[in-house]
């Protein structure tokens, strides 16, 4: 298992981690198999999303803000936990010829809901 570590810069933020995952796959030597990507944080998520248009990333954050509005929640950062729970904490992706099988417009992103802070994403490459 490998760990991607970084510091987020904003309260809510979407960070492309595809290149980090690709590098881990190449270094693993695995040609065909799967890669598991796991976010061990309850206020962040990992997703597959559109990569070419940054306005869609802003739209995603705005949509989640509307779904989980400011309220007098019992927990001080309940909004971040609730938003993260609407997405996912793990992904399993196919690796073929040492490449992640993503669509033309897709990338893997970490979505931050409680930044700025230190974050980790665990990546495990599994051979066929």
Predicted regions and their residues:
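Active-site histidine-anchored catalytic micro-motif
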Residues: 1-128
